[in-house]
Design a protein with these regions (language model features):
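Preference for bulky hydrophobic residues occupying beta-strand positions
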Residues: 75, 91, 235-237
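Structured beta-strand-rich core segments of catalytic domains in phosphoester-bond hydrolases
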Residues: 1-87, 189-193
Length: 241
């Protein structure tokens, strides 16, 4: 869709139905399928593909006790400034099946070891459906090949966790959306962006007059909403030569 296009970038991943795109890898059965929203700058891609988070990785299916088929998309790139190669993985682990999350984590770490050379940088992102206190999280950070960018960032802005259930009033310390990177990647900044937008209510047309503020200030009551049930997570990182 033109609204989702970014100049100089293209979409990566498996496309099962034209016109449907999910920002997080998601598959609701075979009738409502997906295309991943991995972005790349044109001219940098070396290769790309995907595998299913399952015992059978090469075709759509549900793995272990998962409620839905789940997938991981990857891209292999050449950084034009450093001339170093790097890999980008994006996944969505199951929200119901505990075993599926456990085995998916092991599978992804094994795939990274299998596919990526030791000196190539790795970035792994997505909705993991496990927070930083869950034992499955340690599968990634204890692997020796991945670090949590939240922990290694030079500067951090995280006024909330990453899941909001479409309710901007909720507060949590849980981060279930992660950006893992190779330990050698320098993370300058990490942020959870908690911006909201406003929608009208029945009372929006009435100006609020009472309060300790200048009379020229015009205030109206609107409902705060989040564009997603997850907050965006952003990092600024550097590949060291």
């Amino acid at each position: 869709h033109p609204a989702l296009e970014h100049p100089g970038h293209a979409l990566l991943g498996a496309s099962f139905r034209a016109g449907f795109l999910a920002h997080v890898p998601r598959l609701h059965g075979h009738r409502h399928c997906q295309r991943h929203a991995g972005l790349r700058r044109s001219g940098r891609r070396l290769d790309d593909g995907h595998f299913w988070l399952s015992e059978i990785t090469d075709r759509p299916n549900k793995g272990w006790d998962a409620a839905l088929p789940r997938i991981c998309t990857w891209g292999h790139f050449l950084d034009l400034q450093t001339k170093r190669r790097f890999w980008f993985f994006n996944l969505h682990m199951d929200h119901i099946g505990v075993q599926a999350r456990e085995e998916s984590a092991k599978l992804v770490v094994a795939k990274i070891r299998e596919m990526c050379k030791p000196k190539e940088f790795v970035i792994l992102t997505g909705d993991f459906n496990v927070d930083q206190n869950n034992h499955i999280y340690t599968t990634f950070v204890s692997s020796g090949i991945l670090a949590d960018s939240y922990e290694t960032a030079g500067r951090r802005y995280a006024p909330n966790g990453t899941f909001n259930s479409f309710n901007p009033s909720l507060k949590t310390d849980s981060r279930i959306d992660h950006i893992f990177v190779s330990p050698s990647v320098r993370v300058h900044d990490y942020g959870v962006l908690t911006d909201t937008y406003r929608t009208e209510t029945a009372a929006s047309g009435e100006e609020i007059k009472s309060g300790a503020f200048p009379k020229e200030v015009s205030l109206h009551s609107y409902d705060a909403r989040t564009p997603s049930d997850h907050f965006p997570v952003v990092v600024r990182l550097e590949f060291r030569r």
